[in-house]
Amino acid sequence: MPKKAKPTGSGKEEGPAPCKQMKLEAAGGPSALNFDSPSSLFESLISPIKTETFFKEFWEQKPLLIQRDDPALATYYGSLFKLTDLKSLCSRGMYYGRDVNVCRCVNGKKKVLNKDGKAHFLQLRKDFDQKRATIQFHQPQRFKDELWRIQEKLECYFGSLVGSNVYITPAGSQGLPPHYDDVEVFILQLEGEKHWRLYHPTVPLAREYSVEAEERIGRPVHEFMLKPGDLLYFPRGTIHQADTPAGLAHSTHVTISTYQNNSWGDFLLDTISGLVFDTAKEDVELRTGIPRQLLLQVESTTVATRRLSGFLRTLADRLEGTKELLSSDMKKDFIMHRLPPYSAGDGAELSTPGGKLPRLDSVVRLQFKDHIVLTVLPDQDQSDEAQEKMVYIYHSLKNSRETHMMGNEEETEFHGLRFPLSHLDALKQIWNSPAISVKDLKLTTDEEKESLVLSLWTECLIQVV
C-alpha cells in the first residue's frame, strides 16, 4: 500500500539495514508502454480505455476489467517480476516482514508463516510448494527498474505516492481473506492465472484496511479469471478475494496502488491550520481566549460550538478570496517520500549540475518539474510569534529509491531551498514559462537574479538553454 506503511515482522538478525540498489532487468524486450510523458504512460497502461472515460465512469466509482489477448503485452508483463527473481533477490539480503511475507488464508483468516531474520529462497520455495503459501514481496520497484520507471511516472501523473506489492500464489491456494483496502488499486497479471471475486463495498472509498467475514459480504458482483497481460482496477473500499485454481501453474500479480490519505478531507485538514494562522493575524476575535475551564468540560458547550461555527463561516469567506493555500504536510510528505526520477545510468545528472553556468544574460528553464513543489510557509528557523513567511522549494531528485514506501522516517530528509517571500514572483515566472531570460525576472537587483538562478542550478532544478 502506498504511504510509508511500515511492514511488520520479527527480523531479529541484526536490525536489517536498507537494501542496496540492484538492477534486475528482465529480458522482456522493448517496453509495451509509452513513457513519453506521465499522461501517455497512464493512457497506455489502461488501453484501450480512454483516460477521459476512465475518470468519468470508473475512478472512485466502480471496477474496470481489461482482458487482453496480446502475447507481446503478456511477455512484457511477465518481465516485470517472476517467481524465479526471488532467488537473486534473496541472495542480496531480504528480511521477513520488511521485504517479504509468507501467508495463507485458512478458514477466512490470514495465517502468517514468516520465519525470523533473513529470508532464504530455498525456505520460501519449500513453504510455497509444501504449505501452499503465498509469497508477498514488498515494494519491488526498489529493485526492478521497469517498475521504478512505471511508478515514478505514475507518481508524476497522480501527484500522489504510488506503491506496489507482488503476490505469488501456488495452485489450489488463496493468500488473503476477503478484505478491502484504503487505496486505489491497479492489478497487473504477470504469470499464470488467478480467479477473482469482487463485492459491493460496505464502506465506499474506505480510509482504512479491513478484513470482511464471508457471511457479511454476500455474493460477488464480479467474478472472472485474470491472465497474463490483463489489468484490473478497483476503487478503495472494494471488497475482494482471489485464489489460484487447482490444476494450474502458480499465479504472480503486482498490485500498484495510490491515493492513500489523498482525499478532500485530508486536504482540508492540511490547509486549515495555515488558513487559521493567517486569519488570526487580522481578526482579533480569533486571538481572544477561550472561556475558563472549557478544556475541563465533559461535553462541548453551546457557547463553544456557536463560536466555532461562526469562526468556520469567517474562514470560509476568507477562503473564497485566497489565492495561496498553506499546505502544512501533504506537499512535503509527497515530495519527500516519492521516487526519484528514473535514470538508466548512475544518476549523476540528478546530483551534479551540468551544462553552462547561468548568468544574467542566460535563458533558463525548469527541469524535473514534476519532482518539485513550491510552497509558502512560516520561517521554520524562527521560534518567536512574529514568524515571517518564506518560499520553500522541495524536490525529490536525491530521494532514495531503496527506501521508497518502506516507512524509514528516521532516514528521511528534505532536499531543497529556501528564499525570501520577495522571490516568489520570480520563482513563479520560472515555473510558468517554457524558458525565461534571467534579466527579466521580477527581482530588484541583478545580483538577486543571478543568485536565484545559481541556487536553482546548483540543485539541478534548472538548465541554461
From Swiss-Prot:
PANTHER family: MINA53 MYC INDUCED NUCLEAR ANTIGEN, RIBOSOMAL OXYGENASE 2. Belongs to the ROX family. MINA53 subfamily. Fe cation binds at residues 179, 181, 240. Changing residue 179 to Y: Abolishes demethylase activity. It catalyses: L-histidyl-[protein] + 2-oxoglutarate + O2 = (3S)-3-hydroxy-L-histidyl-[protein] + succinate + CO2; L-histidyl-[ribosomal protein uL15] + 2-oxoglutarate + O2 = (3S)-3-hydroxy-L-histidyl-[ribosomal protein uL15] + succinate + CO2. Keywords: Dioxygenase, Iron, Metal-binding, Nucleus, Oxidoreductase, Phosphoprotein, Ribosome biogenesis, Transcription, Transcription regulation. This is Ribosomal oxygenase 2. Its EC number is 1.14.11.79. Expressed in liver, skeletal muscle, heart, pancreas, and placenta. Not detected in brain, lung or kidney. Expressed in several lung cancer tissues, but is barely detected in the adjacent non-cancerous tissues. Also highly expressed in several esophageal squamous cell carcinoma (ESCC), and colon cancer tissues, and in various cancer cell lines. InterPro entries: JmjC_dom, NO66-like, ROXA-like_wH. The keyword Oxidoreductase applies. Oxygenase that can act as both a histone lysine demethylase and a ribosomal histidine hydroxylase. Is involved in the demethylation of trimethylated 'Lys-9' on histone H3 (H3K9me3), leading to an increase in ribosomal RNA expression. Also catalyzes the hydroxylation of 60S ribosomal protein L27a on 'His-39'. May play an important role in cell growth and survival. May be involved in ribosome biogenesis, most likely during the assembly process of pre-ribosomal particles. It is found in: Nucleus; Nucleus, Nucleolus. Pfam families: JmjC_2, ROXA-like_wH. Binds 1 Fe(2+) ion per subunit. Transmembrane segments: none annotated. It comes from the Eukaryota. Its cofactor is Fe(2+). The keyword DNA damage does not apply. GO terms for molecular function: histone demethylase activity; histone H3K36 demethylase activity; histone H3K4 demethylase activity; identical protein binding; metal ion binding; peptidyl-histidine dioxygenase activity; transcription corepressor activity. It is an enzyme of class 1 (oxidoreductase). It comes from Homo sapiens. One of its GO terms (biological process) is ribosome biogenesis. The modification Phosphoserine is found at residue 309. Residues 139-271 form the JmjC domain. Induction: Up-regulated in response to MYC, in alveolar macrophages from coal miners and in silica particle-treated A549 lung cancer cells. One of its GO terms (cellular component) is transcription regulator complex.
